[in-house]
Amino acid sequence: MKEQVLESPFCKKEFLELVDIVSEAKTTKLANYAISDSSIVNIGDRDFVDYRPDISIDPQVLKDNNISSISFDSLHFFQVQNLVEEIDTKSVKIKKSDVAVNLILPKTYEEYLESLTKKNRHELRRKKRKFDNETTSYELGESKEQDIFDIFISQHRESKGEKGEFMTEVVETYFRNLLNLQGWKIYYTNTDKGVLSTAFCYENDDGCYLYNSSRNNEFNSINPGIVLNDLIIQQLIERDMAFFDFLKGTER
């Protein structure tokens, strides 16, 4: 898991530079962290960053900047351990706030189905049948093109509540710039009824990180998001990928 965290897009310099446009301004930025007033904090707001790079803090930095507190989020436990061992502190408070769901991929899709509980396997098959019955044809697509990106954005904005409010013009620009970076792509369900769901992902040689998603809410009853994830899993297994990381969030 350590390698999966540190090889994620969230630890790369180009991502940390880009995520600044949707994050609160920090006073001073150093190597993989920032200083805000008298506190050391992460670079990039937690709503946009699922994993963090390794962080090493020189004790002299604490002294020179009169640091009174260190406040980090989205750290894996191995990173928490390293920081506790490295820094001399009066007290440490660890709070579990998010869960990242990670699927280790088997060698075959049949093995994946067998790994599900009987109930979940039945539910997946039922939902796929319903999708089959409501669509004449469908396939998994992947793209970095503007037309698919526009669908991803519009489906977000047509959503109710926080999901719809999330996609501001600034956030749209952020996602567009992300898509231009190497490794980022949009998976989508290409059907006779149009694009019913999308998944904004990052891929490397080992696996896939599901960063964000959208769907056409008119078709919620046939579960286009679940079908898309299932299609992605099938393709990743066929390509001998090691994992499908759903990252953190309430929709997993």
Regions found by a protein language model. Give the residues of each.
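Hydrophobic alpha-helix feature that most strongly marks membrane-spanning transmembrane helices
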Residues: 157, 213, 232-241
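Conserved acetyl-CoA-binding loop-helix of GNAT-fold acetyltransferases
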Residues: 55-61, 220-234
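Conserved GNAT acetyl-CoA-binding A-motif
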Residues: 67-76, 236-248
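A short, internal acetyl-CoA/4′-phosphopantetheine-binding micro-motif in the GNAT/acyltransferase core
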Residues: 47-57, 213-222
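Structural motif
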Residues: 51-54, 72-80
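A conserved beta-strand-loop-helix scaffold within acyl/acetyltransferase catalytic domains
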Residues: 1-41, 75-221
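Cytosolic ligand/metal-binding cores
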Residues: 252
